[in-house]
Amino acid sequence: MGERGQHRVATVDVPAGRFRMGDAHDEGYRTDGEVPVHGVELRAFSVDVTSVTNAAFTAFVEATGYVTDAERAGISAVFHSYATAPGEPVPETPWWLATPGASWRHPGGPGSDLTGKDTHPVVHVSHDDALAYCSWAGRRLPTEAQWEYAARGGRDGARYPWGNTRPSPEDPRCNIFRGEFPDRPTGHVGTVDVRTFEPNGYGLYQCVGNVWEWCADRFSARYYRTSATVDPTGPTRGTLRVLRGGSHLCHDSYCNRYRVAARSSNTPNSTTSNIGFRTVGDAASEG
């Protein structure tokens, strides 16, 4: 990847500590493996204040000539309401369209671009793409435990980064789908500026909603039963990679995963219009 690049996303150090990891409210999907709740101890680390933005990813691509998985494949998954070109409905989730020409540069497909979206999260990036960015920037993807600890912002056991109060149209607090999913939205559908809404107790923005974020760990629904309790790094086997945080397409009727304990996963080469990432590194005190 050549010389190390400049990571153009603000970071903050998160203190070492112990927290309860998992769903303390019994609201998760059993197949996601959000339980049992278990104590985890982490050393201090640095974490991005926001998801990696289009501007930051552009700097990486311009410096390296990197070509993403979606660009190489010539196709990526786009939510139907903002797809700019016809696509093949994805089986069982027809609101997703496999859209030729969709990529991080063209998030809706051909004819769409990043105008006015420099400070939106980059999307249509695979786990492999995120790792390539991290290698260039001298950063890492967070472990699943680091992600949840940082997202909680010091609110141990809470449902959301701000506490337990559910978001509402009057007090949205995060970017999720409003209206009747998937065809009758009552507001904006898509990504928003990464600093929209209030930050959590550690100063992190939009840890839930907006875009799913890749983690370093492999995914297993059974992992919490045997997880290490000090700086866990996930299972040693498995194809799927962990996704955290939910996205602008989460809705209680379909995907109640915009909670800090919620887990999901995808294959490492998968790309969609609602998946991005943020990074971590060593804390100043650990360097």
Can you describe what each PLM-predicted range is?
Residues E3-R8, V12-D13:
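GGW-centered surface loops in extracellular recognition modules
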Residues G2, E27-P36, V90-E92, R263-P268:
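Short, P/G- and charge-enriched loop/turn segments at secondary-structure junctions
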Residues V9, V37, L42, K117, ...:
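Short coil/loop residues immediately preceding or within conserved phosphate-binding loops
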Residues F19, A24-R43, P110-D113:
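Short, conserved catalytic-motif segment at the N-terminal edge
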Residues S273-E286:
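Short, structured beta-strand segments at or near domain termini in extracellular proteins/domains
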Residues T53:
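Acidic-aromatic/histidine active-site loop/patch
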Residues D13-V14, R20, A24-H25, V67, ...:
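Functional-site microenvironments in short loops/helix caps that host divalent-cation chemistry
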